Design a protein with these regions (language model features):
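Walker A/P-loop
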Residues: 55-91
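Walker B catalytic acidic pair
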Residues: 127-128, 139
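Conserved beta-strand position immediately N-terminal to the Walker
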Residues: 60, 124, 162
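Conserved alpha-helical scaffold flanking the Walker A/P-loop in AAA+ ATPase domains
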Residues: 49-52, 106-125
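Pre-Walker A (pre-P-loop) alpha-helix and adjacent loop at the N terminus of AAA/AAA+ ATPase modules
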Residues: 26-65
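Compositionally biased, intrinsically disordered low-complexity segments enriched in Pro/Arg/Gln/His
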Residues: 5-7
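Canonical AAA+ ATPase core
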Residues: 106-109, 132-136, 144-193
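Short beta-strand-centered segment that lines the nucleotide-binding/catalytic pocket of NTP-utilizing
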Residues: 84-96, 153-157
């Protein structure tokens, strides 16, 4: 084996290092998929797509009927990646402060103290996102687009990575509404189980 640059001008040792890195990454992806497959059966294509989006630091929208494993997929993914996860169950009366947090009076210091909401996590499961108001969705939109949240005039940085897996029921289900384009634009993919 000769040393030095190959015909593309790339050093052979650099090529070998890159190939070894790709092999390690492929092995890690395969391990991740195998771990998720323990919890979700028969959904290999969806699991692979979700894995790719996670590697790209994207957000995922899962649309399907209740009971098909959307929540189980998100929870098993967080466990397999050893990420902190939290969940928001969206309802028509969910408020932005239910997502980002709120300030309360600290009786010891007599000052307002910010209490972080569930969005301050690595993997957020936004369950039934199309059941809540557009005002509440806007709070999540900032988090997904910028990795920050603004509450009461202050901006807070979210943990890195920050990934949202949102679920929605089909628009034909009662109590649902179509997500606005500005919200849909924050998701890298929309998948069905």
């Amino acid at each position: 084996m000769r040393s030095g640059p190959d015909r593309d001008g790339i050093n052979n040792s650099e090529t070998t290092q890159r190939e070894n890195g790709e092999k390690r990454m492929n092995q890690q992806i395969e391990q991740l998929i195998m771990e998720i497959k323990k919890a979700i059966k028969g959904k290999a294509e969806v699991i692979c797509k979700v894995g790719m989006v996670i590697l790209a630091s994207g957000h995922i929208l899962l649309e399907d009927n209740p009971g098909l494993g959307k929540t189980t997929l998100a929870k098993s993914l967080a466990k397999a990646l050893c990420l902190d996860e939290d969940r928001i169950q969206f309802t028509p009366d969910t408020m932005p402060s239910d997502i980002v947090g709120y300030s309360i009076l600290n009786k010891e210091t007599n000052k307002m103290q910010f209490t972080k909401g569930p969005v301050f996590t690595n993997l957020l499961l936004a369950d039934e996102i199309n059941r809540t108001s557009s005002k509440t969705q806007a709070a999540l939109r900032e988090a997904m687009a910028e990795g920050t949240v603004t509450a009461e005039g202050n901006t807070y940085k979210l943990p890195n990575p920050f990934i949202t897996i949102a679920t929605q029921n089909p628009i034909t289900s009662g109590g649902t509404q179509a997500l606005p384009d500005s919200q849909l634009d924050r998701f890298m993919v929309k998948l069905s189980m």
